[in-house]
Regions:
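Conserved ABC ATPase signature
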Residues: 131-136, 140
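The feature captures the beta-strand-to-loop junction immediately N-terminal to the Walker
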Residues: 33-35
């Protein structure tokens, strides 16, 4: 469960968010819709403490977000950015392995799950695992970003325009993969 209680964010004299109250139950999908600059990305960044509210509190499972250890919080949160943030010096497989490695998975577990998820998103591991991000299209990079976010089975998945670089067919395929991953 995630809950925003009277959350606000101000930069100097400008209110970015004002008195936001929101309740999201476990297992619930929630979409923030609004015009550019309305605070959607800001709200997402607050959940994993990339930004801190100036007023109010955000809770996860009835505990204030700011009371969580940042590493613990971020390991339990998958995050897909609109601007894909793959490490350029790492291969696709190495990018995907980051969270599982931090969680103590074995190399075999990581390789098996990486191969499975790459295949599910239409990027066969035999063909893509050893590539660098510079060798991928924007849509392929976006799919890798989604695989990296879901491989560790996060409690919360935050997505900021995750399908913007994808065609309609790839978008539908990824939506199915995401729904199956969180059943």
């Amino acid at each position: 469960m995630i809950e925003y209680k009277h959350v606000a964010l101000r930069y100097t004299d400008k209110n970015i968010l004002k008195d936001v109250n929101l309740h999201i139950e476990d297992g619930e999908f929630m979409v923030l819709v609004g015009p550019s600059g309305s605070g959607k990305t800001t709200m997402i960044k607050m959940i994993n403490r990339l930004l801190e509210p100036t007023d109010g509190n955000i809770y996860m499972d009835e505990k204030r977000i700011k009371d969580y250890d940042e590493r613990e919080l971020r390991l339990s949160t998958g995050y897909v950015l609109q601007a894909i943030a793959l490490f350029p010096n790492l291969t696709v497989a190495e990018n995907i392995a980051l969270i599982p490695e931090m969680k103590g998975w074995t190399k075999e577990q990581i390789a098996s799950k990486t191969d499975e998820l790459l295949d599910k998103v239409g990027l066969p591991a035999a063909e893509y695992a050893k590539r660098k991000p510079s060798e991928l299209s924007g849509g392929e990079q976006q799919r890798i970003g989604i695989v990296r976010a879901i491989i560790g089975k996060p409690k919360i998945l935050l997505m900021d325009e995750p399908f913007s670089a994808l065609d309609a067919i790839s978008r539908k395929q990824l939506q199915r993969v995401l729904l199956q991953s969180f059943k």
